[in-house]
Amino acid sequence: GSTPDTINYVKDYLFIISLFNIFFIVSYSLEVIVKADGFPILATVGVIISAITNIFLDYIFVIKFGYGVKGAAFATGIAQVLSTIFFLSHFLRKKSNLKLVKFKFDFKTIGKIISLGFPDCTSELSVGLVTILFNQSLMRFIGQDALISYSVICYINTLVSMTMVGITQGVQPLISFNFGARENENVNNLFKIGIKTMFITAITVFELCLLFANNITALFIDTKEVQLFNSTVYVFKLYSFSFLFLGFNLIISGFFVAIDKPICSAIISLGRSLVLVIISLFVLTKLFGGD
């Protein structure tokens, strides 16, 4: 999905960031396990440490030392290393309920883990494929400025979707616990609470995006770039309507995982993040082109 102008930057960034892949995977996994261990605040602290470290090192490597894209990649990778160490240290403390111990491979358990994790896995993998397809379509029908607008929307979408993922992950273990205890009434009540919370979040995010579209866009694009700025604001406002529905897909998919129905969850995840997106992309570009 890169262009001739950005290909070298992409190569540099991907090469360096790939050196830290294991830390991205382990850090994210441990964050979820720490929450499951009953320490959600600690998990939040770990994420904040990673974010602050990333910002600080970006300033040092990119601005002070002038390392450019390579510096940004190293900053992100090192932040994940520190996050991984922080989360690992939790399981070495006495207060943790879960401990690091020797284990034997139980393929039945591993199969269960894979089946329950498959819906989220497909969603994550779909992001890369969809991004490539969108980049190619934007370059074909509009041009490089469209990639800038799309990048801005992707940043905002990530922030919004992660907020909604947080709500989903917050209610999932509670639903799973009550489902295992056969407390069906509690399961239904928790699901309703999750839906209501997601509804309030969706409405709030949508209204904020519409009201402050100009201000948010100005964080990424110089207002002096009038045409690019205005087109990004326009597209951003249109895209904001998707936030009204995004959270419900996430929480319903997460609910099915929590009650041990991964196939239903996988169907929703694949439809939301890949199948329907690709179909819509091809159909709408055929009908409307760059519009």
Predicted regions and their residues:
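Short alpha-helical transmembrane segments in multi-pass integral membrane proteins
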Residues: 1-22, 64-118, 175-242, 284-291
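Short loop-to-helix capping motifs
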Residues: 3, 39-40, 68, 143, ...
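Hydrophobic/aromatic residues within transmembrane alpha-helices of membrane transport systems
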Residues: 10, 19, 34, 39, ...
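Transmembrane helical elements of multi-pass membrane transporters/channels
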Residues: 16, 27, 50, 79-83, ...
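Generic alpha-helical transmembrane segments of integral inner-membrane proteins
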Residues: 22, 26, 48-56, 60, ...
